[in-house]
Amino acid sequence: MEKPAQRATAIIVAAGRGIRAGGGEPKQWRRIAGRSIVEWSVNRFAAHHAGFDVVLVIHPDDEWRLNGLDLPTTLRVVHGGDSRAASVKAGLAVCCDAGHVLIHDVARPCVSLAVIQSVLDATRAGGAAAPALPVTDALWRGDTHVSGTQNRDGLWRAQTPQGFDVSAIRAAHAAHDGTAADDVEVARLAGIDVAIVPGDEANLKITGPEDFARAEALLTGGDMDIRVGNGFDVHRFGPGDQVWLCGISVPHTRGLQGHSDADVGLHTLTDAIYGALAEGDIGTHFPPSDPQWKDAESHIFLTHAVELAANRGFSITNADLTLICEQPKIGPVASAMRARVADLLRIDVARVSVKATTSERLGFTGREEGIAALATITLVAR
């Protein structure tokens, strides 16, 4: 009878403190498609049919971040050190002496079960293995100018997980007290031969802000979280000599009436954002019964909605506003309105449309009793 394979351990190294990926916190705790990067990476190994014992190495200050995460109950959590090597050593310290270990960077949440299996099979067969992709781009040498080229034959882009015999890699790390690019370098310095198995372009390492969108597309199968919100508002004319529309003062024989400055354009855009977020409307956040909002400038409301969207992880990608009125004429000030709206939404003016129409003299707008506005906003999760 064939002897069953020994159970393997997976060490997820997640003790880093770097925040260059943005977000104001270590990247492994940021969320992608509703889950933290830690959850994605840990559960990749927990879901593998090999039945890994999973060890998560974190910084001591991050212990509280585990609360409420979707992690396996069998997960072992240990505290890492001041360097990656120290964190790997902490993880290896709790591994059993026999068997094999796969060491994985938490910042690669898109690793496939196939890559994990390939590394595990090659490690069991030869004692050590790691995934990599051949370098296909031309390589240059130089600083601000090209001083030469580099032959790319035999060059590889390293990935994780990197697999080893537990005892061998533990001894290699114990003997190594310097810096190393990864565990393969530590292993080679100890005389361990490491096999190369095919890597995967999807197994990207999240390093900069732009990598989050790529990772989300990979993890969700390209099914991005896109929201569309609609807004509609009406304000009647009253005494005055100007109207505020889209943050621009437009001279007119009458003004618009309202609790605030009655900017029907900004109100409609604000409600469209709240609608896309399922966050009610302006009245929910700025009740007209509250005297502090009497005669308030409407950009306050729109800025609140924009910041709420950003805090929820959404970017505004498009805004389309239609003003419905007979007077005043919108065409002469439409460009200024677009620029002001783009500034408030924090997007390029090319993503903002402000246009006007009439109701062919029908209804209250046709009778010039007021102005109506309709807006559509598109939000995309970052």
From Swiss-Prot:
Annotated segments matching region 2-C-methyl-D-erythritol 2,4-cyclodiphosphate synthase: 227-382
Site (Positions MEP for the nucleophilic attack): 152, 205
Site feature Transition state stabilizer, where: 20, 27, 259, 358
Positions annotated to bind a divalent metal cation: 233, 235, 267
Family membership noted in the UniProt record: In the N-terminal section; belongs to the IspD/TarI cytidylyltransferase family. IspD subfamily.
Function text: Bifunctional enzyme that catalyzes the formation of 4-diphosphocytidyl-2-C-methyl-D-erythritol from CTP and 2-C-methyl-D-erythritol 4-phosphate (MEP) (IspD), and catalyzes the conversion of 4-diphosphocytidyl-2-C-methyl-D-erythritol 2-phosphate (CDP-ME2P) to 2-C-methyl-D-erythritol 2,4-cyclodiphosphate (ME-CPP) with a corresponding release of cytidine 5-monophosphate (CMP) (IspF).
Name of the molecule in the record: Bifunctional enzyme IspD/IspF
Provenance organism: Jannaschia sp. (strain CCS1)
